[in-house]
């Protein structure tokens, strides 16, 4: 029995070696692509995004999580029975490459980030915060809804730095906290707090009372 199986396996390999193009390409004969001779895969451009997603569907495995900052755009593709009617995502990175991904936790995070990054209200927030004003900005109800859908209610960032004063130095910690909230009347509140502490929580140090600009 083992000899028969090996013989059958060798026969299949021989057929695919002789008829390589039909064996490998026949399931994807409907795929149409515009490509130069032997291009790297990242330069392959498909005439239709659906064709690209359908081609890669059977080979898709979850990719390791990636930062949303690596990507410049995305496209959502609905597939048919060949992909079990799944929704796939084409993620475009800044090097001109395209990732074809199924829905996952990190992919949803990337989509959430990209779909809100170019919204007008989210671009105005840092511009307003960097300019002296009375703190009141007029926004529309639609802007408030977009802000509420994409905002992070509370975020904390820590930065360690060293203050050096001659022969003495202190290890300091800068803590940046931001809060965002959308009220029922669609008014928006956005606050930022900056605090400085010493790494070992000493009370009076260069970190909290510096005598030089860092």
UniProtKB/Swiss-Prot annotation:
UniProt KW Protein biosynthesis keyword: no
Gene Ontology biological-process annotations: entry receptor-mediated virion attachment to host cell; symbiont entry into host cell
Any one cellular-component term (Gene Ontology): virion membrane
The entry's keywords: Host-virus interaction, Membrane, Viral attachment to host cell, Viral attachment to host entry receptor, Virion, Virus entry into host cell
Alphabetical list of InterPro entries matching this protein: Herpes_UL130_cytomegalovirus
Record's subcellular location: Virion membrane
Keyword Transferase: no
Primary subcellular site in the record, as a coarse category: virion
Function: Plays a role in viral entry into host cells. Forms a pentameric complex at the surface of the viral envelope together with gH, gL, UL130 and UL131. This complex is required for entry in epithelial, endothelial and myeloid host cells. Mechanistically, engages host receptor(s) including neurophilin 2/NRP2 to mediate infection.
UniProt family annotation: Belongs to the HHV-5 UL130 protein family.
Subunit structure: Forms the envelope pentamer complex (PC) composed of gH, gL, UL128, UL130, and UL131A. The pentamer interacts with host NRP2.
Protein name: Uncharacterized protein UL130
Organism: Human cytomegalovirus (strain AD169)
Record gene name: UL130
């Amino acid at each position: 029995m083992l000899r028969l199986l090996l013989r059958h396996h060798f026969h299949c390999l021989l057929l695919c070696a002789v008829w390589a193009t039909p064996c490998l390409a026949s399931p994807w004969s409907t795929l149409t692509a515009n490509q130069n001779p032997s291009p790297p895969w990242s330069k392959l451009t498909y005439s239709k995004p659906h064709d690209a997603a359908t081609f890669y569907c059977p080979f898709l495995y979850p990719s390791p999580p990636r930062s949303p900052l690596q990507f410049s755009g995305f496209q959502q593709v609905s597939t048919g029975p060949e992909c079990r009617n799944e929704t796939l995502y084409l993620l475009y990175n800044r090097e001109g490459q395209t990732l074809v991904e199924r829905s996952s936790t990190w992919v949803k995070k990337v989509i959430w980030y990209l779909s809100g990054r170019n919204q007008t209200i989210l671009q105005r927030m840092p511009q307003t915060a960097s300019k002296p004003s009375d703190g009141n900005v007029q926004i529309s109800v639609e802007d408030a809804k977009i802000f509420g859908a994409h905002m992070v209610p509370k975020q904390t960032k820590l930065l360690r730095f060293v203050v050096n004063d001659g022969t003495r130095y202190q290890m300091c910690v800068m803590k940046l906290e931001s809060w965002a909230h959308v009220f029922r009347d669609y008014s928006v509140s956005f606050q930022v707090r900056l605090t400085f502490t010493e790494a070992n929580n000493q009370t009076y140090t260069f970190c909290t009372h510096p005598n030089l600009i860092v």
